[in-house]
Amino acid sequence: GIIVVHTGLLRQASDPGEVAGVLAHEVQHVEQRHSLRQMISSLGWGALVGLTIGDISAVAAMLAHQAGTLYFSRDMEQEADRLGLLALQRAQIRPDGMLRFFQKLDDEDKAKVPGWISSHPQTAARAQQIRSLIAATPCPACVPLASQHWQAMKAALPPTAK
C-alpha cells in the first residue's frame, strides 16, 4: 500500500513523535488490508442486491462508488490505533506522540461532525483508548524520537496556499 504524507500533517504536528504516531496508525490500515476488507464487504452487499433484483450492473456501480469513497469502520480505526501503538513500542519509540496528536485533533473536532455520523470513533474516545493502552503496556525501553532537525524541516516546508 501507499501512504501519502501531506504538508498539513507536518505543519500540525508539534514533534516527530506525533508524525510517527499517525504513520504507525496508517501503516496498520495497510498491513491489516482494511481497504480491501471494506471493498469486499461492500461488494458482497452489492452482489446480494444485484442478484436479488437481477441487475449485475448494481454490483459494478457499488464497487465503483466504494473505490471512490473508501472509509474505515470504527472497528478498523480502533484496530489501527491499537496495533499502531504496539508497533511503535516494538520499535522502542515512545507512543505518547500518538496520544498528543489525538488530543490535538479532539480539540479541533469538538465543534465539527457529531460522533454518531462519523465512521471514525470520536477522537476523545480514541485518545482515552490510547491512554489506557499506554498504561496497560508500559515500555521502559521506549524513547522519544530525536527532534534536532524538526524545526529546520518545518521551516523548509512550502508556504501554505491562501
Language-model regions: role of each:
Residues 1-162:
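A Zn2+-metalloprotease active-site environment signal
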